[in-house]
């Protein structure tokens, strides 16, 4: 139910902004509305949720010195892998979320195509996540994530041949949704596997540190990527006006295509 609400709000955002004038004030108003709703939902979740599972191993780990817990974390090679996967997943989400609007406007010719691309990518993703279980049992989480990452990269590279056809770009977005579904569907269970592996290898269960570090990695990746995108757009001469100079349009196209390829190449 929440996913359907997310789809509808994402698809409706740009049309609503355009109907409200399409200027900075319209963006601020819509963002403010979403922010108020988000704060309310977060507070609801915080005050309405109670953790009922607390293993003895986790309790004992919390009593250990920080140096011991961080040592167990660093010596867990799979933690570093999942950390980088989480970080560059955030890189992809930032690139796609930031640049896709400009790609729709300056490459496809209408910024409302962003809503179409968003739906085209997210609907297949959710469908695939819902049916992942039997494939995980047969092929394993790692193999599915690798196959999905390769599929996403290959699909994105086809945009080099046909970058400005809305139907083709939407089809590529749908394939991206299928490709990224295994990682989105498995990332948190893979973190749990990392916790169990670390406990087996070191005798120290540091689940709080692992999940916290992965979350920090996501925030760091998204923040740094956003700053880099801003710098590159500025250097290209991007102004945000209805008409952009060729260098700015080329930067939008390159970021949209190669940013995704780069992120998923690192994940692999």
Model-derived features: where do they sit?
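A late C-terminal transmembrane helix in Major Facilitator Superfamily
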Residues: 202-236
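Intracellular loop-helix junctions on the cytosolic face of multi-pass helical membrane proteins
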Residues: 1-101, 105-110, 255, 260-268
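Transmembrane alpha-helical segments of major facilitator superfamily
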Residues: 34, 116-125, 218, 263
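Residue-level signature of mid-helix packing/kink "hotspots" within the transmembrane helices
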Residues: 122-130, 181, 223
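Transmembrane alpha-helix termini and helix-breaking/packing motifs in multi-pass membrane transporters
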Residues: 8-25, 223-249
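Helix-loop junctions at membrane interfaces in 12-TM secondary transporters
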Residues: 160-173, 184
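Helix-to-loop junctions at the C-terminal end of transmembrane segments
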Residues: 17, 127-141
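Structural signature of the two symmetry-related core transmembrane helices
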Residues: 143-158
């Amino acid at each position: 139910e929440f996913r359907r609400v997310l789809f509808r709000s994402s698809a409706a955002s740009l049309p609503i902004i355009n109907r409200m004038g399409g200027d900075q004030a319209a963006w601020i108003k819509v963002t403010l509305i979403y922010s108020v709703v988000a704060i309310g939902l977060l507070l609801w979740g915080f005050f309405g949720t109670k953790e009922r599972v607390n293993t003895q191993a986790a309790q004992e780990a919390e009593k250990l010195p920080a140096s011991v817990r961080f040592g167990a974390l660093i010596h867990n090679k799979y933690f570093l892998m999942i950390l980088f996967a989480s970080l560059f997943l955030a890189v992809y989400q930032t690139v796609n979320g930031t640049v896709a609007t400009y790609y729709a406007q300056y490459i496809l010719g209408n910024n409302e195509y962003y809503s179409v691309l968003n739906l085209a990518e997210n609907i297949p993703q959710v469908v695939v996540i819902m049916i992942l279980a039997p494939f995980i049992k047969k092929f394993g989480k790692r193999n599915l994530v690798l196959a999905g990452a390769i599929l996403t990269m290959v699909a994105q590279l086809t945009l080099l041949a046909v970058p400005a056809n809305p139907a083709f770009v939407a089809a590529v977005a749908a394939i991206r949704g299928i490709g990224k579904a295994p990682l989105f569907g498995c990332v948190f269970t893979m973190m749990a596997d990392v916790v169990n592996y670390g406990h087996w290898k070191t005798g120290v269960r540091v689940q709080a540190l692992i999940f916290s570090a992965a979350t920090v990695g996501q925030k760091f990746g998204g923040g740094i990527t956003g700053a880099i995108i801003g710098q590159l757009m500025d250097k290209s001469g991007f102004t945000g006006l209805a008409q952009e100079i060729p260098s700015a349009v080329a930067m939008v196209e390159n970021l949209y295509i190669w940013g995704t390829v780069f992120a998923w190449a690192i994940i692999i």
